[in-house]
Amino acid sequence: MLRCPLFGLLLLLCTAAALPAAQPCFPGAVGYGIETPGGRGGKVLTVTTLAGSGPGSLREALAAKGPRIVVFAVGGVIDLAEQALEIDEPFVTVAGQTAPAPGITLIRAGLRISAHDVVLRHLRVRPGDCGKPKKSGWSPDGLSTYTAQTPGAQGPHDIVIDHCSFTWAVDENLSASGVRHAGRAFTSHRVTFSNNIIAEGLAQSTHEKGEHSKGTLIHDNAREIAILGNLYACNTERNPVLKPDAAAVIANNLVYNPAKRAIHTYWNTREYEGKMQTMLPATLVIVGNTLWTGPNTPPEMPFVFIQNGKADVYLQDNLTLGPGGKPVAEVGGNPKILKECPFWPAGYTALPAKEAAEHVLNQAGARPWDRDAIDERIVAGVRARTGKMIDSQEQVGGYPKPEPTRHTLTVPADPQALDAWLESFIPKS
């Protein structure tokens, strides 16, 4: 029996088989794909420059072949100059916690992952509008997993994005994507987004469509997706959104001030023209989450909205709080409500929603022990219920400009000691 652990109790609500997890990619990892080794057992590559490319750069380390662990001898801002970082070589761990304060922030572009077996931790990604005119067509994601456009390429899989901060994207802040009509193997699968800040998607900005503040898109057919313990703040919608046949566990997240939709599903007839008979419903397991409405939230908005009833939804212990702490509707759109949990990540125990929100505010984002001014401001705005939608990073202080820092890393000679060494950079609370 697959067990759906909640509040420390083992609730026998599911029926699919589950095996005990292998060694996780880092201590405490939960979700799907966490058995990936990432770069474990490979070479250690040290980032020694904040340049956007060239020798010693993060771009060079990500492009290297073979298993690799990327660590940082420098801290500060990496200006990507409108050229996204590509991770198309598998088996990599990016350990942002190894950077000296203030850590690593990527600006003026984001990350794209088409590889498998990727672990990314403790980075900030803040693409922004690059000073371009509104509706000019600049539409970067913060981070997106996607399927490479090569013959037979399968979708990215076994990917863990943990304790990162994603803000100011013009398309989605953080997404799992792929090919729409090629089947499940050709889109993202076994992907976990955990303990991230996903906030302030730019609204009336440079996207050609105009308003486009989006949190997370889970693409058609993406399966075994875990969205756990994240802070979604001040994104118009997609907090997250699932497309047809996508399947995700959405647990212990705090969603603040969605301006149109919080959790929802979406599809349009143009994308499925001639293929409606093949369209399968999305499946959402929504447990222990909290909605806090804000200045931009419409009063009639439900926490979960299902377009045209095309979804199966399991709901448990979600808090939906409007002005003055009054509850708002949990679900709208007439989905099929499941009485039993259809799937659940092995070994994961959700917190009660009444505890999860505070946990998220304390622990989410890159380097929660060493938050930058942007993350501090976002979290403070959530706590005070004053955070609002923005159209440009210039409304909230602009791109960060910390002084570059440097330190010396002493990488253990014993490969067996590397995991403990990487964790030693994270203060234990």
Each predicted region: which residue ranges?
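Acidic Gly/Asp/Thr-rich repetitive segments characteristic of extracellular carbohydrate-active
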Residues: 26-70
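Acidic glycine-/aspartate-rich tracts in secreted/extracellular proteins
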Residues: 51-53, 75-77, 98-101, 294-297, ...
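Boundary at the C-terminal end of the N-terminal hydrophobic targeting segment
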Residues: 18-22
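Right-handed parallel beta-helix
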Residues: 79-224
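Bacterial N-terminal signal peptides
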Residues: 5-16
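Extracellular beta-rich repeat passengers
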Residues: 242-397, 403, 411
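Residues in short coils/turns that link rungs of repeat/solenoid architectures in beta-rich domains
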Residues: 127, 168, 200, 233-234, ...
